[in-house]
Amino acid sequence: MTEQKYIVALDQGTTSSRAVILDHDANIVSVSQREFTQIYPEAGWVEHDPLEIYATQSSTLVETLAKAGIRSDQIAGIGITNQRETTIVWNKETGKPVYNAIVWQCRRTADTCEKLKEAGLEEYIRENTGLVVDPYFSGTKIKWILDNVEGAREDAEAGKLLFGTVDTWLVWKMTQGRVHVTDYTNASRTMVFNINTLQWDEKLLKELDIPLSMMPEVKSSSEVYGETNIGGKGGTRIPIAGIAGDQQAALYGQMCVEQGQAKNTYGTGCFLLMNTGKEKVTSRNGLLTTLACGPRGEASYALEGAVFMGGASIQWLRDEMKLLADAKDSEYFATKVDTSNGVYVVPAFTGLGAPYWDAYARGTIVGLTRGCGSNHIIRATLESIAYQTRDVIDAMQADSGIKLSALRVDGGAVANNFLMQFQSDVLDVAVHRPKVTEVTALGAAYLAGLAVGFWNGLDELADKAVIDRSFEPHHDEEKRNQRYRGWKRAVKCAQAWAELHDEE
């Protein structure tokens, strides 16, 4: 019997598929990554080829094992984390998708969403799925495929078609069609899953004309779903033992498994999740209620808020404003001035996300005086990321009644020490940056490792989650509140721009 020394995390993202091998000390041993094609058939439409997703993901698994010289019989289990909401429908007899995957960013089902609102279902959807009515989620995408692909509706009614988010599709392919399953975190992003009963919501399936027979079985995020022989030699079968959507996997990888623990992922936008434990909190402040993972990978509730423009606003300074040659330089220039000199940048380029949800707001720079230079604008742009994060955290605290004790952070922008310190100052809480920033892959690996007994419990992993640096707040309260009031006024200016346009 060969000793099983490793866990593999498959990280299927929006632009690339990755495979990450971890050892027993949660060190990353090997990584392999492949990008795949983004398909834009019409303005606002985004698709992927499901077969290409599977091909890139399975090849990274084989490649990363080969690169590290690790045999498949040394792998204790596989954890999967994935881009959420992206929708795949396939024929279970042929194994072929009936249409491309409709990606989470795709806006083609806006009309269907309007009809759901007109039918008075907004409140029902919020109460029972935790979500707002939006094309972002899977439900209306499934309906679109059944309504628009020739023969799909008939085949679905005849029980020939299956639906899955990306995790479900990968597991189905990796087990040669033996296992049709998803986990609670992915199911909670479909807009047809009832987060109170933890069952598919038959009322919403009926409303969208989706047969229940298409839907996968829903299980916890940490258990053995099936086995795969991909990368296996001589009949080796590797258990697939963990599944979580990318943001929930990051929350778990950051060890935010107890009520009141929260993380912020600073990517193109920012994704904030706060674990609310066994208590479902319905937001009155524009946040989503979703399912996350408790200590053993069981379902727990969370609040989620998204900021549209995080790192993307730094790219704007570089690409459009030409104020930076490299995004990394933003920290250097921001620290060349002591303050932003009363300048606020509101990067509402595509409207404002949580908690405002104002699609018509537009970007503004306010408070300019003759003494303002490019460094002030760079600094104010970085500050805007921290202010927007506070907007969401304030909403989370108001909804849940839970005071945040510390914020865990991950994503590209966390390397910016100025931003992290300012974030701590604005929130008046400590900001913890982990040493291993691959927290999404870590989360998937932890979930799989716990299910197969590779690790005994999260407490065994706690000492592996080493903090690289903690940023402590060090500004007086009066200054903090004064600055934040200025930000709120600046946001009103961004919103008023659209309102004034209506009056013309």
From Swiss-Prot:
InterPro entries: ATPase_NBD (IPR043129), Carb_kinase_FGGY (IPR000577), Carb_kinase_FGGY_CS (IPR018483), FGGY_C (IPR018485), FGGY_N (IPR018484), Glycerol_kin (IPR005999). PANTHER family: GLYCEROL KINASE, SUGAR KINASE. Glycerol binds at R84, E85, Y136, D246, Q247. HAMAP family: Glycerol_kin (MF_00186). Its EC number is 2.7.1.30. Inhibited by fructose 1,6-bisphosphate (FBP). Key enzyme in the regulation of glycerol uptake and metabolism. Catalyzes the phosphorylation of glycerol to yield sn-glycerol 3-phosphate. Gene3D superfamilies: 3.30.420.40. GO terms for molecular function: ATP binding; glycerol kinase activity. Belongs to the FGGY kinase family. It holds the Pfam family FGGY_N. ATP binds at T14, T15, S16, T268, G311, Q315, G412. ADP binds at T14, R18, T268, G311, G412, N416. It catalyses: glycerol + ATP = sn-glycerol 3-phosphate + ADP + H(+). GO terms for cellular component: cytosol. This is Glycerol kinase. GO terms for biological process: glycerol catabolic process; glycerol metabolic process; glycerol-3-phosphate metabolic process. The gene is glpK. NCBIfam families: glycerol_kin, PRK00047.1. It comes from the Bacteria. Keywords: ATP-binding, Glycerol metabolism, Kinase, Nucleotide-binding, Transferase. Pathway: Polyol metabolism; glycerol degradation via glycerol kinase pathway; sn-glycerol 3-phosphate from glycerol: step 1/1. Coiled coil: none annotated. Sn-glycerol 3-phosphate binds at T14, R84, E85, Y136, D246. It is an enzyme of class 2 (transferase). The keyword Kinase applies.
